[in-house]
């Protein structure tokens, strides 16, 4: 947001121990004549999907659309309303629904759909979203910060998720920046909420058998994210631990990993051959049946402990529960550590 008075802006990054250190700073005067004051690009009418109160007293969540033509605005609004309802089906968002205002904007695109470079598809869309970010075929991001900020500035917001007009599975979530999700994918109920969890509460991915575009330190420093730890004997969620649960907490890890590695081979083969998305949907459904049974019938299923395997690593990082929306596409919902983290953010913004 534009400051009302001169400010100093400091950019910080995390060091090897996940501690913030300043890397650059500059002074900004909002009256500086070099600041551009041209009109913002056309974003279309602001849609109030849910207005619970004054933006000063609520969490303001903005859903943006990318890759929708002017003729597809109705499609976007329908999908935006759908994902809003899906978000508020999940605890703790469900219990805090009235703490949220939800807005939507959809700048018209000249082309329908978004870029997917790995298959030769390139589109010029208002927000610039694209698959294949950082070489990961399912990672959807925009690197045009100014483009989406210019559109988002036409609405009240603290949090933003970009719905892409696409069916291929893909999305992304960056803490305190934005999240994305492919609106037409069959797993949108999981995908939209999972990616929003990254953006809204800084939740870590708890899965660790999928190919990812990041590399962790071999030293395994304590993660800054609230739902992963390198210290299973003294986890950051120790106040939530179930009585009598051993630490670290045993689970059918080897069986899960053996099955998951075979599943990942099938997944890569489908993408490598550019086979129909229906085949990926079928694979996801098959995997969900297996994982739901394995993770839901274990000795410590539903208990809070310290289960090894999280934050993209099979060893050295632990999650609070055996299953979670940040771990699988199952219907487990958010784990205890995630729920507490989400509620903490809601309390920061809602009065």
What are these regions (language model features)?
Residues 99-175:
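Active-site-proximal segments of metallohydrolase catalytic domains
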Residues 1-36:
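Beta-strand-enriched, solvent-exposed domains that form extended recognition/catalytic surfaces
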Residues 37-89, 104-114:
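Fold-level signature of zinc-dependent metallopeptidase catalytic domains
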Residues 53-57, 94-97, 152-157, 174, ...:
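Extracellular/periplasmic catalytic domains that process cell-envelope and extracellular macromolecules
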Residues 67-70, 108-112, 166-170, 186-188, ...:
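Solvent-exposed loop/turn segments at secondary-structure junctions
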Residues 196-212:
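Catalytic Zn2+-binding segment of zinc metalloproteases
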């Amino acid at each position: 947001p534009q400051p009302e008075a001169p400010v100093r802006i400091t950019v910080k990054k995390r060091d090897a121990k996940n501690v913030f250190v300043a890397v650059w700073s500059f002074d900004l005067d909002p009256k500086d004549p070099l600041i551009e004051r041209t009109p913002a690009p056309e974003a279309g009418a602001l849609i109030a999907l849910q207005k619970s109160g004054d933006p000063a007293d609520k969490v303001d969540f903005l859903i943006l659309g990318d890759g929708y033509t002017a003729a597809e605005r109705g499609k976007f609004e329908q999908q935006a309303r759908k994902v809003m309802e899906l978000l508020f089906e999940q605890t703790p968002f469900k219990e805090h629904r009235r703490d949220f205002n939800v807005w939507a904007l959809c700048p018209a695109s000249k082309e329908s759909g978004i870029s997917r470079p790995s298959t030769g598809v390139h589109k010029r869309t208002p927000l610039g979203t694209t698959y294949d970010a950082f070489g990961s075929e399912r990672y959807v991001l925009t690197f045009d910060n100014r483009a989406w900020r210019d559109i988002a500035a036409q609405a009240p917001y603290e949090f933003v998720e970009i719905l892409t007009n696409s069916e291929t599975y893909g999305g992304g979530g960056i803490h305190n920046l934005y999240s994305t999700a492919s609106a037409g994918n069959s797993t949108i109920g999981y995908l939209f909420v999972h990616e929003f969890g990254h953006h809204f509460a800084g939740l870590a991915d708890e899965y660790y058998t999928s190919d990812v575009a990041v590399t962790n330190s071999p030293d395994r420093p304590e993660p800054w994210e609230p739902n992963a730890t390198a210290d299973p004997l003294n986890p950051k969620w120790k106040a939530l631990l179930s009585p009598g649960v051993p630490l670290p907490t045993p689970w059918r890890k080897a069986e899960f990993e053996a099955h998951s590695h075979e599943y990942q081979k099938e997944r890569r083969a489908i993408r490598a051959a550019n086979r129909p998305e229906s085949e990926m949907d079928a694979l996801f459904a098959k995997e969900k049946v297996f994982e739901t049974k394995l993770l839901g019938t274990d000795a410590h299923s539903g208990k809070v402990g310290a289960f090894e395997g999280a934050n993209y690593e099979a060893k050295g990082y632990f999650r609070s529960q055996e299953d979670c929306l940040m771990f699988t596409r199952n219907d487990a919902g958010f784990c205890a550590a995630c729920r507490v983290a989400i509620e903490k953010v809601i309390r920061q913004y809602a009065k």
